[in-house]
Amino acid sequence: PSLKIARGLSTARLREKIAEVQRINQSLAGTRLLCGAEVDIKNDGTLDYPDDLLRRLDLVIGAIHSGFKQGREQITNRIITAMHNPLVHIIAHPTGRLIGEREPYDVDMACVIEAASRTGTALEINAYKDRLDLDDAAAREAGKKGVMLAIGTDSHHLEQLWMMELGVTVARRGWLESRHMLNTLSAEELLAWTQARRQRMQA
């Protein structure tokens, strides 16, 4: 909710969103609408919504949207701290780059990938044309470490969904296969994966 520029939802509005999705699901036959949120990773690695609210979401994506000038150790530990939260499933746009506009922040991607492997946290290949983050080299290293990846378009309009093609291209350039990608799972398989990760981190 602290990220106003991206129309971040207040806790009250997120609760309303969850309730709305539940109402929709009650009216659907044979289809389930999942409810998730991209949640700001604060400077200390904690999340911008309370745990009791995050537990009600099917999918939680952690992302850094501020504090880009933190030192290498601090920003790396910030991401890894978020990974150790059992309620976080995916880390979005892990390097924060905006092509031609902003350099990646000074993060130790080898350490992040290793932590993702240990914690079972997935990493995003953000397919937005100005991000392409992870890039193909980092995506390949993640896949080699057994890390699951998720392609997201960062779309704010239907017309931007075509950028999924760019994300698929990054994954292919990284020699990734369907077995590496959360996108290839059925809804049931995805929910089983999220539950398994949560149980693993709470053990």
Language model: regions and residue ranges:
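Charged catalytic cores and adjacent phosphate/nucleic-acid-binding surfaces used
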Residues: 1-32, 41-203
